[in-house]
Amino acid sequence: MFVNLFLINIILINAYKFQFEHLITDYIKSFYNNKSDEPIEIANYDRINSDDPNYIYIPIFGTSDIHGHFYPDKFKLEQLNYSQGGLDYMTKYINIIREEFDNKMLYLDGGDLFQGGLESTITNGSIIVDYFNYAKLKGLTLGNHEFDYDKQYMDEKADQANFPFIVSNLYDKANKSRKIYGDKQVITEIYSFKYNVNNEEVEIKIGVIGLTMILTKNQITGGGFDNIEFKDYKSIVEAEAKELKNSKKVNAVVLLSHIGFWCGYSGTGQDVNFTLNMYKKDDKQEPCAQDSNITKLLNDIEDGLLDAVVTGHSHCEVHHWIKDIPIISTVNNGAYANILYLAFDKKNKLKLVPSANRIEGPLPICEKVFNGTHRCDFIENSKLAPFLPIVNYKFHGVIIEKDESMNKIHEKYDELYNEYQETICKIIGTNEELKRYDNGSFYLGNIITDIYNKYTGSQISIISYKGIRSNWSPGDLPKYKIYDILPFGNNLCTFLMRGEHVKKAFKILQSGPRRFYVASGVKQLVIRTDDGDYLSSVKLFDGYEEKDLEDEEEYLISANSFLINGGDEFQKILRFYKPKNLRCDYGKEADVVFKFLKEQKTIDVRKYMDDKNPVIRFINKTNKRVIHTKLYK
């Protein structure tokens, strides 16, 4: 009797909850749908005045990790069509700020320009350099993925560019020089701005120091960099900043870097920093990572040497401060940007006033935003998001639309890119975006490794989730998304490996710095401790039952050519294992996925997202705050 009453109560509670949710969604739909068709203003806060009576504000428009994405990503669901990104819209923001501040602004980029977007691949990166030229980029530093290409490729991009590569911590041992790109590379750069203050002409100079990531030395796949060294950050930054401030008398020093920084990850592993605002130092925000290279650098160097940071690499929204130093960074693929405003005192010798510095962002880059969130992206797991209309919008009173200065780029490249717009299949079974990494889940990796097993007949398939460079959304899947997700051009390979080596290999993979590797055909148990993660067991798993791996039995494994040639943690595996019956003639990874999905026409992803049957199970034995990671069959 008690059980029946309990069940009835649960049913009634859920019924009321369902009815309440529908009332709320009906109200919101009615509220927003009754709005006029006029574009909404998204910058609803106190803005920086270019004619401020106390300060001269110089805006620094910051981007990073564009990863070859010139065109917007377009998503089509049954009742919802939206897009995200598109450098036409980015340029509109830049030109709005440029006009407001009478061309006295800096546009800087934190690197990782080319590797990723199909449009960059099929144009050899030229479309991205053309964009930066048209948008009047003032300088960029190099990301780790710039070293995926041969030096000759990068030399050609440098020749095409109307802006310098600002990098101070590279060293060419052969030429005994810090310049590896000749006159197109500078160690530091100084930008000068002239103003009239009290009928007197004054000048403000901003010095920029560029840094690229030291760890790149272990990830270079392009040729021609054998003699290149990556130097330590601290000594170079201190020396260059002192030179800029003491000898060249700049008013402020900005660090332009690609060395990684993140703030505000919630316990779910989600970046929570997407609220557009005008931020100041004392605003309450989520804490920043204390173990990041940027944090360590800013804490280690002498106070007063750096005044601001524009950085990249971590694909996170950052509009935060370390000490008195404002830092901006953004997510990948040109989906957002930030503006950092440096304040110089008109009444005190144009000295920088850290307390008056501001950060405006993150700016949504897209054709239309969701009314109610002011974001371009579909907010997964939200019952209300599909009912929020997608509307035109304004920034600082100006409608965001395609900037006409980009027309020549479209005339040059659109026809080639449009060949990849066909829909190849439909993703069903979820309303969530399928991310390469999300709250410890690797849904895309589960799908891709399963495709590799089915295509090659392998028993086990392995991929690094960091080799997956974009996300899928439910609904129609266009051809170009396949090549955005797997842009590196690696071949799919198979090889035989004995069971004892399989177990040893997985222990290396799942305890290394690039863990966790996504795998199909096995089930794993990982222990998390204060000293790190380690694999407790790995067994064959066909989706229904587990079997022990026999030490002497050989198993057919599939992985990409980058890994089997010693990329990432596989360099350690190749110390004890020599690939047997290696075959790499299946074609490129992206081509394999494209062929497979085109034949399927639809793919139901529910089995890859079923948390009742995880293929990696974690036992947490750490006292530290960790993000619990799950993988699903």
What do the predicted segments below correspond to?
Residues 183-397:
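Functional cores that coordinate and move charged inorganic groups
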Residues 87, 92-176, 298-302:
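Core catalytic region of metal-dependent phosphoesterases/phosphodiesterases
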Residues 55-59, 101-106, 135-138, 161-164, ...:
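Loop/turn elements at helix/coil->beta-strand transitions in domains of secreted/extracellular proteins
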